[in-house]
């Protein structure tokens, strides 16, 4: 994790996770329990135009990702252990954020670790499949991603994989599409940043001698470069490999196998098997 991203989680995300009402943790303000703002699970990045209009030339503001706060213990009366199903899970600290690849960028999921202290003494993370399956369906369906061992894909990317596979565009084509969309978003942010800097340059150019030759003389030395798409210390753009997309698509299909089989069994049969028992007597006579 780059330094700017680490500071972002420390300064912005961490205070929301550890909001207290007296001695006890309370739901984050973005959950909208007080009714002052619309409730949401998402921490949205600032609008680039707002910071650029005020000439805040800090690329890390434009790099900021979306963050999904998954805190199910605030959304159910009792968070029960999915193993023993008898004891209430206790909070056991926040998990490291997990990066999820979406259609045109990546976002992060942040959750808690839970511990069944009085029961089976098992540990669970908020995105553990068994814990997700134990939640009410309406709450479980709000989780936005399917996770792998270290990363994950959003449901929107998986839907794109399914639809692409149905229309003869496999994981290779979907990866090319994701790369195009991710780099396009980066290019738009970069263009906004550069155009805002040039606006300052043009404004200063009118105030200096027309004999000035170098553009760099108009730009403050404190304006940092925007960086490259794949620079891990800056924007850190990322698109998964074709093999990873294939594995995740197969994982999603296997997860839905039971429902697919149940759906197939409910369909009206178009053709029934033909009874070939009359051939048995013919075979016996031939022997």
Regions found by a protein language model. Name each.
Residues 1-80:
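N-terminal alpha-helical interaction blocks
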Residues 52-58, 86-91, 153, 269:
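Helix-boundary capping/turn motifs
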Residues 59-65, 92-107, 251-256:
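Short linear interaction motifs
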Residues 78-84, 116-119:
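Short cysteine-rich clusters marking metal-coordination/redox-active sites
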Residues 77, 112-113, 268-272:
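Core residues of folded domains in eukaryotic genome-function proteins
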Residues 202-287:
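RNase H-like nuclease fold core
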Residues 73-74, 107-110, 118, 264-266, ...:
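Intrinsically disordered, low-complexity regulatory regions enriched in Ser/Pro/Gly/Thr
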Residues 89-222:
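DNA- and nucleic-acid-binding/regulatory domain cores of transcription factors and nucleic-acid enzymes
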